[in-house]
Swiss-Prot record:
Organism: Dictyostelium discoideum (Social amoeba)
Segments forming a coiled coil: none
Protein known as: Protein raptor homolog
Subunit structure: Part of a complex, TORC1, consisting of tor, raptor and lst8.
GO terms of biological process kind: cellular response to amino acid stimulus; cellular response to starvation; positive regulation of asexual reproduction; positive regulation of cell growth; regulation of autophagy; TOR signaling
Length: 1509
């Protein structure tokens, strides 16, 4: 499947380019991007035809990419829906737990932080025309031209002036704005004056010194060049050291003279000498400063002593002496042997830069130290200067001298039509190609940092070094080797020169025709088209591990051309899509200024690819945000975002770009706010594409992050209300984004009652997320709640104090009750009513009621999250608790005189809870499957509570099974547990009573405020249907009186989400021991936890000391993780690399799996025709911990058996050889056990899903090894009944529906038993099915390809449900024939999936078709069975018994065999059978016993040693 972005264009031939110029000083010598659309006259007809052909090719190439990303996603979804083996829990959030990779790609230093200009140029010409230097013997004829002018044709002085002007004009073509100064046949003083003047004016910018020494001797071996002194001698040396001093830094030198390499050598030597002097000078200064400090300290002491003794005069004399000594030390500096003694001072006066950077100066020399300049009369004498300043002219002349072309003269070469700046002319095209070729050579040869310095830092320097590459090629042919500093690798034989020669050849071959007929058509070179094709070929086969594409700089140059621009952008986008390494390369080559200026283009055909390119750039380097704001680039993306007709993928990428612009960038936030980004994002929150919704939310979150003005604008737009609607979105990423955005709205409400009310309402609204199936969403919830805690810290500290005090009092009461029970030996668990009454009536702990205020409710939610089954969630919540707990002193609490109180009274131990009644805050609405919100004011009422009601919405919390005290205790028990180290904890035999609160009415009167929370007729319907009662929380406009501690608030909740919140608050209040009535059995739960008050105090202190604690506020990394999506390939085909190891392994596994399925079909047919006569024992092994075996699961294709024991340990075995592969802990809460276990994904990646008595469903991946083991997800199956280790839900039964990714769970819940369906793709509870009986579900099974599933009950009922039917009507049929506990049910594929096979504990096995009211077949096993299994495809049934026997029979009830003994001569009797299971395909059966023995039996074996007939 090709998952790609659409970069096709329906009108490429008419695509318009940029009409705006690009002034870019940091581009490779190109000042602007011009289209010149109006210049397509008759002279360019051939160009137009070529362009049209190129556009057609572009269209053909681009159309090969998939139509749109949206279509690709639809295709992927279609393929997934039609793939019956689609893996689950394979999303990115499951692979990395929504945590960004800490090993981020290192961003290359592509941005030139020290960008500079060459602002001054000194042209020093020592020609002495008419007089040859004495040390050079010239040939005859020899080269005479200087700057393409023969000086012998003019008088010497006039020729000298003309050469100077011509050289200046040649330089001005490369840098027209520089300040040029000529010094013709100068003296030393003139050179000095010139250099100091230019340096003074240039300040910190670069100065160029061009030296032509053709009329003077060669440089000396002492580091000197020659100038003139007319007063004494003809030639006088000028030290390079002095020249360095006058020029300062930064500077660039061009030396065009014989033996110029000597100058380079001495220049570097002097630079090193200067560095050593500067280091010595700095060291002296340091020593002097230290001496000054010591002397100053000593003087101060002496002053103090002398002032005491009256010896002032002596001290003053000493100070004077010290001052004189310091002055003499500071003035003592060393000067070099060659140069002025004031060189350091001169350098400082001439340059503000440090002389230590002399080695960083750039030098270009015409030849090496032992070479002389070429004297070929066909070329100018200053060939090196010609190469540097007129590269095209000298290149054409050199090419003709080496070409077989005839009829081309030098005069013809000088008359090539066009100009250098017009790319549509022959001369301009040659210059354009030359720039691309030299850039490409430099890019592929030079190190990246050197390329950046020489080709991207300075416009003039870049031009000179491009031309220097040509000089190396031309002058080497004349046995002359140019030298540069920094030294470059050899480039004169690079392959790109051949492409340059071809382009030159094509132009010169047309030259006679073009000169003869000015109207002749010029045939453009196919150079760029061919290079783009080469780049495209590289994209097809290249990768990060291969050499980067050589044509990348050419792609950059092609962006200047309208004809090639679209194709170049598409190819560039494909290259950037390869990964962050490709983006780094593109930025280093200089792509940034080009694509930045392209944002000013109105061309619609460039929009999609420009958005994609910018998304790739910003995914790597966020620092580009300021550049975008500065160039008004954000407006481009806002315009894309504001057009609903633009494809979703482009709007998604635009939202990402805008979010990056706003990320920690106040100018970006302000610009986007002014640009009306907020209403645009809000208008698209209901977009059908979840990626659009997600990034619209994150874009808004980043816009108002720490930006109060944007927060107020969001509140005015009711953004918080609209975001609340998305808390139940079907996409977990959208829900997490909504939580992040709402969390970012929190904070900064100081002094604003309206904002305070809104923030508290938002925090209460977020409570519904605690029931979310996705750990990613719950993690973001904790972080958002931490912002509330930070904003209202004092209120939460007060709540925490009161809860801690209450727990101490409760521990005292418990100790007293235990003491009395030991004395009386009559009551072991019933508390004294009088004590409880006194606790309620006389303790000032309940007088202020702050625990049941808004802050109290939120604090209890946080405490509940401390025991979240997912570590990342629990750890963050625990850090909040630790931070708040550290704010108050435990010793102070323990010193309170609360323990010695008497006259306790339990008559009215009712929880108190203040709600929220806020003006200007808000309320929530749940209607027709959507969670609605209206945050204009709230009076939350609770009545006729319903569970559910939103489309995929989460289930309301009702945490009535755990006290806050138990929460504190369990925090320390669940932290830092290693899931790979199985524990040996034994299952406790006693369970605490399960608390129920669903029918309790909580009445609280606090400070005159009444709270009503009525739980009447909980109606849990089908969440996915519109039959639900519409839910709302009505706003009565009541005002909140927030006095800082949360008192004097009122909550009234209606049904729907309001009911969910009410249930949450009520249950949290109950779970903290603050709610309920005399029937509340909280004391029983407490008594089962501890036997003394001291243990409670120790537990609480242990929590404060053991939890990780960070003073800083929790930080969400969800945004950074979300950004990773754009760093990964987005338009690449998802087709397999058939040569990779992974592809070969996958192909092998696919063939193996098909073979296993085929062999199993044959085996099933054989069994149908001739049932097996025995099941021979294949393997036997034992669990080392000695625990009973509770569950067995065969892997469908690998020789793996997954085993769980009677506690919380899971082991993985190779059943072929009986070797244990791995063992790990399920991370249950203490005292609970694994109650169900299934395998998820028949094909890779296989995972284990477990359910335990603690009410938690866990998903494990990589279970074959501890190195790969990871908890993918975990959630509470019934979050409204959150449990601790002492009050488990009971047997939590789980079934996995692999075709649709549904998890069916049921258990012994406090209220009416139900079956809940969770959708693992959406990670939401989607349906509650009421079973219509008070008995408990013991087992479940589903048809593999349909909506039906069956459930067995503890009272013998078997019911068939249709998940398409909502609520209490889901049960479509009931079998009442069983009279005892249902051990297991099955809906085997061998019976079409429509027949239910059930087995009861008395041994009855019934076959039941749902279209009938009674069973069609009954098999009487005549034995009590403890385990029961049916083969999925073969007509085989296995029954295990506590009587140490396994019976295997067919569907007609005929016994196949009975297993009583293990194999062997002295076969031991098998233990009491606790579980049996068939292999999904093969005729294999596994059996586990209470003696920890596991046996594997093969139905194809002919052995009879273990068979009892």
């Amino acid at each position: 499947m090709d998952k790609s972005y659409n970069f096709s264009s329906s009108n490429l031939a008419n695509s318009s380019g940029l009409h705006n110029s690009i002034n870019s000083n940091n581009v490779n010598g190109v000042n602007n991007i011009n289209n010149n659309n109006n210049n397509n006259n008759n002279n360019n007809n051939n160009n137009n035809n070529n362009n049209n052909n190129e556009n057609v090719n572009n269209h053909n190439n681009v159309s090969n990419i998939s139509n749109t990303h949206q279509q690709a996603k639809k295709k992927e979804k279609y393929n997934n829906n039609n793939n019956k083996n689609k893996p689950f829990f394979g999303e990115e959030r499951h692979k990395d737990n929504a945590t960004p990779d800490v090993q981020k790609t290192k961003i290359a230093k592509w941005r030139m932080r020290e960008r500079m200009k060459t602002v001054s140029v000194a042209l020093v010409l020592c020609l002495n025309i008419g007089v040859d230097p004495p040390d050079v013997i010239k040939t005859f004829p020899c080269a005479r031209m200087e700057c393409w002018f023969d000086p012998s044709t003019q008088p010497p002085q006039k020729a000298l002036d003309l050469i100077g002007k011509t050289l200046q004009a040649q330089y001005e073509k490369w840098q027209s704005k520089a300040r040029y100064k000529q010094s013709l046949d100068p003296t030393v003083e003139e050179v000095k004056k010139l250099c100091l003047s230019l340096r003074r004016n240039a300040k910190d910018e670069r100065v160029l010194f061009h030296y032509n020494g053709h009329g003077v001797p060669k440089p000396t071996t002492n580091g000197e060049i020659w100038v003139f002194n007319r007063n004494f001698t003809q030639y006088i040396p000028l030290s390079i050291y002095e020249l360095q001093t006058w020029m300062g830094t930064p500077s660039i030198y061009v030396f065009d003279c014989s033996a110029a390499g000597l100058i380079i050598n001495w220049f570097n030597q002097f630079a090193e000498q200067r560095d050593k002097e500067l280091e010595r000078f700095s060291g002296n200064n340091q020593n002097n400063n230290q001496n000054n400090n010591q002397n100053s300290n000593q003087n101060n002491q002496n002053n103090t002593t002398n002032s005491t003794n009256g010896n002032t005069n002596g001290n003053n004399q000493q100070n004077n002496n010290n001052s004189n000594n310091n002055s003499s030390n500071n003035s003592n500096t060393n000067s070099p042997n060659m140069g002025s003694s004031n060189s350091v001072n001169n350098n400082q006066s001439g340059s503000s830069s440090s002389s230590s950077h002399q080695r960083d100066c750039i030098l270009l020399a015409a030849c090496s130290a032992n070479e002389i300049l070429p004297m070929n009369p066909d070329f100018p004498a200053d060939m090196f200067t010609a190469c540097l300043t007129t590269p095209i002219r000298i290149a054409l002349r050199w090419f003709c001298s080496h070409s077989i072309l005839t009829g081309i003269t030098a005069d013809m070469l000088d008359k090539i039509p066009g100009n250098l700046s017009s790319r549509r002319t022959p001369l301009g095209e040659l210059n354009w190609i030359f720039t691309a070729v030299t850039d490409t050579i430099a890019w592929n040869v030079l190190p990246r940092h050197l390329f950046q310095k020489l080709f991207r830092q300075d416009l003039l320097v870049a031009s000179l070094f491009r031309n220097y590459l040509l000089a190396e090629r031309i002058m080497r042919s004349a046995n002359c080797t140019p030298i540069s500093c920094p030294r470059l690798p050899p480039t004169y034989q690079h392959a790109m020169w051949q492409a340059w020669d071809l382009a030159v050849d094509l132009v010169i071959s047309q030259l006679p025709t073009l000169l003869a007929d000015p109207n002749a058509e010029f045939k453009s070179s196919p150079f760029f088209t061919e290079q783009l094709t080469a780049f495209e070929v590289w994209l097809e086969f290249g990768s990060e591990h291969k050499d980067p594409p050589a044509q990348l700089p050419i792609v950059l140059q092609v962006l200047l051309s309208q004809a090639h621009r679209l194709r170049a952008l598409v190819l560039l986008g494909k290259f950037l899509d390869l990964g962050p390494w490709a983006v780094n390369l593109a930025l280093c080559v200089g792509i940034f200024p080009y694509v930045l200026k392209l944002l000013q283009s109105p061309a619609g055909d460039l929009r999609h690819i420009l958005v994609f390119i910018w998304a790739k750039i910003l995914a790597l380097d966020k620092s580009c945000q300021l550049d975008l704001v500065k160039e008004n680039g954000h407006a481009y993306f806002i315009s894309v975002l504001s057009s609903p007709q633009i494809p979703a993928d482009q709007r998604t990428m635009s939202a990402f770009v805008l979010s990056t612009i706003c990320n920690n960038c106040r100018p970006g936030q302000n610009a986007c706010l002014i640009g009306n980004l907020l209403p645009i994002c809000l208008s698209q929150l209901n977009d059908p594409d979840p990626m659009v919704r997600r990034w619209m939310i994150l874009c808004m979150a980043k816009m108002w992050e720490n930006f109060e003005e944007a927060k107020w604008a969001a509140i005015k737009e009711n953004a918080h209300e609209k975001l609340c609607l998305l808390l139940t979105d079907v996409s977990p990423e959208v829900r997490a984004s909504a939580v992040v955005a709402l969390g970012e709205l929190i904070g900064g409400a100081e002094g604003s009652e309206q904002r305070t009310n809104i923030e508290l309402n938002l925090a209460l609204t977020l409570a519904v997320i605690t029931a979310d199936c996705s750990p990613m969403v719950r993690k973001e919830l904790v972080i958002s709640l931490s912002r509330i805690v930070s904003s209202y810290e004092s209120n939460f500290v007060q709540v925490a104090q009161e809860i801690a005090q209450e727990e101490r009092l409760r521990a005292v009461l418990e100790a007293k009750r235990l003491e009395e029970s030991r004395k009386s030996k009559k009551r072991a668990s019933v508390p004294k009513i009088s004590d409880a009454d006194h606790l309620n009536n006389n303790s000032d702990l309940y007088g202020n009621g702050s625990q049941s205020s808004v802050y109290g409710c939120l604090w209890k939610i946080i405490l509940n999250l401390c025991t979240d089954p997912f570590d990342q969630v629990a750890n963050r919540a625990q850090s909040i608790v630790k931070r708040i707990s550290s704010k108050f002193s435990m010793e102070e609490l323990m010193s309170h005189n609360l323990i010695n109180r008497t006259n306790f009274n339990f008559n009215n131990l009712n929880g108190s809870m203040n709600g929220l009644n806020s003006s200007g805050s808000g309320f929530l609405n749940s209607s027709n499957g959507n969670l609605g919100a209206s945050m204009n004011g709230s009076n939350l009422n609770s009545s006729n509570n319903n569970l559910g009601g939103s489309s995929g919405g989460g289930f309301g919390l009702n945490n009535s099974n755990s006290s806050i005290r138990n929460t504190f205790v369990n925090i320390s028990r669940i932290t830092n547990r290693d899931p790979r180290s199985p524990t040996k904890t034994k299952l406790g035999n006693q369970r605490s009573p399960i608390l129920t609160s669903s029918t309790n009415n909580v009445g609280t009167n606090l400070n005159g405020n009444q709270l009503n929370l009525n739980n009447n007729n909980i109606n849990n319907g089908n969440i996915n249907n519109n039959n639900n009662n519409n839910s709302s929380i009505n706003n009565n406009g009541n005002n909140i009186n927030n006095n800082g501690n949360g008192n004097n608030n009122n909550i009234n909740n209606n049904n729907g989400l309001g009911n969910q919140l009410a249930n949450t608050f009520q249950s949290l209040s109950l779970s903290s021991g603050l709610g309920g009535n005399k029937t509340n059995k909280m004391s029983q739960s407490i008594s089962s936890m501890n036997s003394s008050s001291q243990s409670l105090q120790n537990d609480f202190l242990m929590v404060s000391d053991s939890m990780p604690f960070e003073e800083d506020e929790l930080y969400s990394d969800y945004y950074e993780w979300s950004c990773n999506y754009f760093s990964k390939p987005m338009m690449q085909s998802t087709g397999e690399d058939f040569e990779s190891f992974e592809s070969i392994e996958k192909k092998w596994k696919r063939q193996r799996n098909e073979m296993i399925i085929q062999e199993s079909k044959e085996a099933v047919q054989n069994i149908i025709q001739q049932p097996p006569k025995s099941f021979s024992q294949m393997t036997i092994f034992a669990e080392p911990n000695g625990q009973p075996i509770s569950h067995l699961q065969f892997h469908p294709f690998d020789n793996i058996l997954v085993v769980s024991d009677g506690l919380e340990n899971i082991s993985v075995w190779n059943y072929d050889d009986g070797q244990r592969i791995n063992t790990f802990n399920n991370c249950n809460m203490s005292g609970t056990r694994i109650t169900s276990m299934k395998l998820v994904n028949d094909y890779d990646p296989s995972m284990i899903i477990t359910a335990a008595d603690d009410g938690v469903v866990r998903i494990w991946r990589g279970y074959e090894s501890n190195d790969t083991l990871k908890m993918v997800s975990s959630w509470r199956a019934f979050p409204e009944f959150a449990t601790t280790g002492n009050d488990p839900i009971g047997r939590l039964v789980l079934d996995w529906k692999g075709d649709s990714g549904l998890v069916l769970v049921s258990g012994e819940t406090p209220d009416s038993p139900k079956i809940r369906i969770w959708d693992v793709e959406r990670e939401l509870g989607v349906q509650d099915i009421f079973i219509g009986t008070e008995s408990v579900v013991t087992c479940m099974a589903n048809e593999k390809r349909g909506p039906l599933f069956s459930a067995g009950f503890s009272d013998g009922l078997v019911k068939l449900f249709d998940q398409r039917i909502p609520g209490k009507y889901s049960c479509v049929s009931t079998l009442t024939e069983h009279k005892s506990y249902i051990v297991n049910v099955s809906m085997p594929a061998s019976l079409g999936g429509k027949t239910v096979v059930s087995g009861s504990s008395t041994g009855e096995i019934k076959f039941w078709q749902h279209s009938y009211e009674c069973s069609s077949t009954t098999i009487h096993n005549n034995d009590v069975i403890s385990s029961f299994s049916v083969h999925e495809y073969a007509p085989l049934i296995a029954c295990g018994s506590q009587n140490q026997r396994i019976k295997i029979m067919n569907f007609t009830g005929e016994d196949v065999c009975t297993i009583r003994y293990h194999d062997g001569f002295l076969g031991q009797r098998i233990g009491p059978v606790s579980c049996v299971a068939f292999h999904p395909y093969n005729i294999l059966m596994g059996a586990g016993a209470t003696d920890s023995i596991i046996s594997i039996y093969n139905g194809d074996s002919k052995s009879k040693s273990n068979v009892d007939w």
